[in-house]
Amino acid sequence: MRVITWNCGGGLRKKLDIIESFKADILVIQEAEDPALSTIAYRDWASNYLWVGTNKNKGIGVFSKYPLRSLNWNAEYSIAGIAHSKAKWKTSDLETFLPFECNGQVYLAVWTKSGGTDSAFSYIGQFWKFLQLHKADIKRNDCIILGDFNSNVRWDKHDAWWRHTEVVEELEQLKFGSLYHHQFNEAQGVESEPTFFHQYNLNKAYHIDYVFMPNHLLGT
């Protein structure tokens, strides 16, 4: 199976030739339009898809020639000993995640966002919260986690416990690792291959997209 994740930056309907050239079996696309509310040509191309988002122009789209099944992962979590509204959350509070199954394999499509009013837990904080809710689901299903995390260990804040470093450590405790870092034998934060160029500027290169999978799938 060839699986590709890509933040298309919007306007996927205008970039179909690009993505088709990779001949993927599964496409996980961030900032994709909702095919149901877009052009007929785009809807016909999508045909078999899943989509979630709060803006019809930019959400997570999953496209495949194989049957797709959305998974209804819902849970609530609270941090013990902290009496604050921000210390309790549920799956639907977080953006943006789409668990799905294809050909017997479970995937979690990721596009972390600013968190709206929950700005303290923006981007990687959104995934950290999701991880607290769904560790058992991820572990039990040998889930492949992939997408745009908008995060890198270089941006860790010293006063947060939901930093990129802690997320990677929690995944390692579940016996999950990063596909890129395994293949390239590089440490987090010193990636030689960027996945994003801010404002399309080659001098603003960052590595913010990841695939995490069980160690036994990595061959470790």
Q: Where do the PLM segments sit?
A:
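Short, flexible loop segments at the rims of nucleotide/cofactor-binding pockets, characterized by
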Residues: 3-10, 85-88, 120-124
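Active-site beta-strand/loop signature of hydrolases that rely on acidic residues for catalysis
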Residues: 3-7, 18-38, 107, 130-157, ...
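Short catalytic/ligand-binding loop motif for oxyanion handling, primarily in non-cytosolic enzymes
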Residues: 12-14, 35-38, 59, 71, ...
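Flexible loop residues that form catalytic
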Residues: 32, 184, 216
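Structured beta-strand-rich core segments of catalytic domains in phosphoester-bond hydrolases
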Residues: 32-113
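Conserved beta strand-loop-helix elements of the APE1-like EEP
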Residues: 56-73, 191, 198-219
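Active-site-proximal loop/helix segment associated with metal-binding centers of metalloenzymes
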Residues: 107-122, 169-172
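Metal-dependent phosphoesterases centered on the DNase I-like endonuclease/exonuclease/phosphatase
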Residues: 125-208
